[in-house]
Amino acid sequence: MSAAVGDWNLSWAHERSRLPPDKRVLWGKMPNGLRYAILEHPGVPDRVAMKLLVLTGSIEETDEELGIAHFIEHMAFNGTEHFKAGELASFFQLLGMELGQDVNAFTTFDHTIYGLEFWENDEALIRKGLLFLRDIADGILFEASEIDKERNVILSELRSRDGLAYRAEVASYQTFFKGLTLTKRMPIGTPQSINSLKRNKFINFHRKWYRPDLMVLVAVGDVDALKLDVLFEEYFDTIKKPSTPLPKRNIGRLKTARSVDADAFRISHVGSATIRAASVNPTRKRSESFESKRLAFNQKFGLELLQQRLGETIPFGSKGGAGFINYFGHDAAVASIEVGGKQWEEGIRALDRVIRYTYNKGFEEKDLEFHRSRKLFRAQKLNSLYPKMDPSTICESIVKSITDDTVFVGYDQNLLWETKFLNDLNKKSIHRSFKETWDIDHMAFHIAGEVNIEDGEDKIKKTIAKGRKDPVSLSKFQFQSDFEFEPTMWGKTGVVVDTKSVPEIDAHLMRFDNNVRLNFIESHLEPGVVRVNVRIGGGFFDLKKNIPGLREFALQAFLYGGTNRYEPYQISSIINSAMINFGFDLADHDAFSFRGTMGSEALEYFLGIITEYLHKPTIYRFSYESAIMGAVRYRMSSSIGIQDGYREFQSYLFEGDGRFAWGTRNDYTVVSVNDVRDWLEDPLTHGYIDVSIVGDITKEEVIENMSQTLGALKDRRLEKKNTAPNREVKIMAPAGYRQLEFTGQEHQAMVVGYWPINRYLTLQDRIALQVLSGVIERRLWERLREDLGVSYSPKAEFLSYREYPEFAAIEAKIDSSPEHAPDLAQAILEISKDIAENGLSDAEVAGAIGPIKIKTRQAFRSNEFLLDFVLKRAQEKPETIEDAIAVKNDIVATVTAEIVNAFAKELLHTDNARAAAITPKPYIGLFQTDTDLP
């Protein structure tokens, strides 16, 4: 029997379906209506993820309450019955959590979620967390003074979110979901409503909607479900059962156009335009079943194929996308591309043409097979990872099933079903689901960007109508295919000639007879998966001269040329079908690094592809020119907004140092193909190679794969040619305050603080600096967010730069309004000076050390940590292993307040502190639109 009330479902979805739920989950319901789900999942020892879901959101607001649901989410952290305002961050810190990272909350149209991540399963910690969640349910104080403080914080959050993409999305919703209440209920609210909300409105809204029958507790992790069940009852069954019935939700009524609908949102000075097409229809009411899940999967699969097709058939477009969303019983298929502003007519016709062609003709078998193979691979790998999966991932999937009102059959079971769906689907079934998804005659189109459209709606409709008179056809300029990689003999089979074991961390260090190094740890933390890092040469250390802008496209110039046997698209096909991720970068300044994650069986392919690239590395002129154009397009597309202002700050700090500062488009014009060749060809051909592998594979299998690939290359250098930077890192910007400007959103700004250190640092030193950055962040949070409310999310981070033993820095980033930015920059300098002169308390240091200690203990259960911190550079720099052993032996505990305060005095004094206010240049024309946004 259904427990639906109006538009609310107050029972589990599996109680209204023939689909069986995951039997491993303890499903419960208290007499007051509060539901809970507990899943024992000991895959990560001691880890527990817990969420309180409140099935209410911005859709419940009245016109006078806009933004209040989200505002209440904030107020939960600003004073409750058992936790005073300002105490919560310190409380979580002492428990090993950091506010903002492990404690998260967010509000949507129809629900609000509060989450806790426990790194240690301690009953006292769990009880404290439950007490906090219980306070959220009926113990938020809503003190007027705290409301006023948080009001400014929310205005700061609104300002930080309110960029080009957000405004364009809101405008498109008003076109696609015309008539639905959600178009006027954006969760963040409006400045006017946020400023008008009084205490009584908070109390009334919270009392009305935070009721136990709209609450669900979900916990997943290394727990005893029955014991946690008792704790849930202890803390939550005393919440009073509501005495009034739930009112019907006011979701509005979709206004369906008689034909194609369209609108535009004009934004000046951006150069480009985003074109979206959507088909919105009421969800078909059907009971959930295996077949309904298959249909939903096929619809999603078809849209993924559409996204792939957009990238292959519209050469002048970029960022092609397609997806499926559902709001309040309305399904929406959405597709989009980005084009130059002057190309909007060509772009909208092309987008419409691809959708209509697919509607009429369906997909090609080879496209379907290529995408099927990729998804099968990923589903199988995720399923193998399930036993060791982080509980937060599974917790989120249970919560999503509740908010979607679908049966949770089990994360792993769902992957098995997806595998069956993938094996069963065919061209006919995907084409049929695609046609059910799109109503071609009633589509809605939206354009956002720098477009000059008079009589916007009519002009767009006429453009579409004109395009629909032409025959529908497609031609590809890019190709994807299931291309079989065939390993070859690049040379004689390699042989291991040196080996060393490190029992403290179960590592094996080896060298092949061609001097290629191998570092290996066999780990079963991720069943069936391996992680690899291949470091080649000296990276920036091999760059003979400073060439600004070179780093922004040089690696692409190499990759875009392909190899002697394979074209780039063929290599891309291999990567997409056989690997979880693959990359080539200079994130480590002291090496060119190939990185990848894959199934154990695909290690041979990963190593083979890299060997292909290194066998006869060549930089072609055509690939260099393609990379230059890509860099120019990227800079043009990101030349508006704060990100460009931050690039300006980096250039200000490092004054033309191409390792850190960004080049300009003018810099690109003076970089020649020979500059790229002079930098890359020697290290890629002859340079030192250090391979680190961690994962679920045996040492013998790794050696066999290596011996036939990288171990078979011609002899490489025994040692690195350049083991140190050819010039020291210098901060050229003088200490003190500086204002920088960017072109973009006139209401947004950023403030950055920077404190460099130029001397040799031990491991203990670097940990102490990490602690210091944590205390700086807490001070910024207290003053700028909690006391003044002028910043939403101030951050501070220790930048280790491990490749530069005599350079590191602490950087703080603060979101701001343009008018407040100069004052906040001065506040950073004042806080810095105060810490340098007066020091930190023992409690502050202990609070910052707590999360580091707990997460460090957990880190050795992470293959990513083992690869990046333990193995990387293990033979090049043996002290890396010594540091790893020291961390395992709890070197963090040796960091004292005295050590941290010594660094505070050394780093944070006035002569070493830099602060910049990054503000928008004044100009007219941004965000011109005919639509008033909520």
Describe every region a protein language model picked out:
Residues 2-38, 224-292, 303-307, 369-373, ...:
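Proteolytic maturation boundary segments
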Residues 151, 167-177, 181-194, 199, ...:
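Hydrophobic, small-residue-rich alpha-helical packing segments that form membrane-like cores
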